Amino acid sequence: MSEVSIIGLDIAKNVFQAHGVDVGGRKLFSRRIARSKVLEFFVGVPRCLVALEACGGAYHWARELVRMGHEVRIMPPAYVKPFVKRQKNDAADAEAICEAVQRPNMRFVAIKSEEQQASALVFRTRDLLVKQRTQIINAIRGHMTEYGWVAPKGPSWV
């Protein structure tokens, strides 16, 4: 396995799929890895390019792999999809990720730090709460209208 140059990693809830190729693009391995064994697997792999599809957990795994010395690139799923050659499954997805990362015009997603992720989480959570509050106010206003009570717009009137 010393000649591996690129690994496409399809991450999932419990079992990940890794697809490794050499410099010439020849398949060296395709294996399933339990979530608990992923870091252990990459300790035994020489430093290489690891490609991930942007999804839940991708930033976490990217940061972990960068700490181990690997070069990591994250791609949007829409850019990976055209490279799936056969029926959609974890092995085909890992192979497609591995293929897509080699394209010269591929666009990548920047790896966010934990601080950047936490900041984005706060803003997304606030937006969600504001939307939910608006939905509740509108529902109450609608129910009130059914009984003949009409309230002006705005949260202070409901």
Language-model segments: what does each one mean?
Residues M1-V158:
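A detector of single, family-specific signature residues
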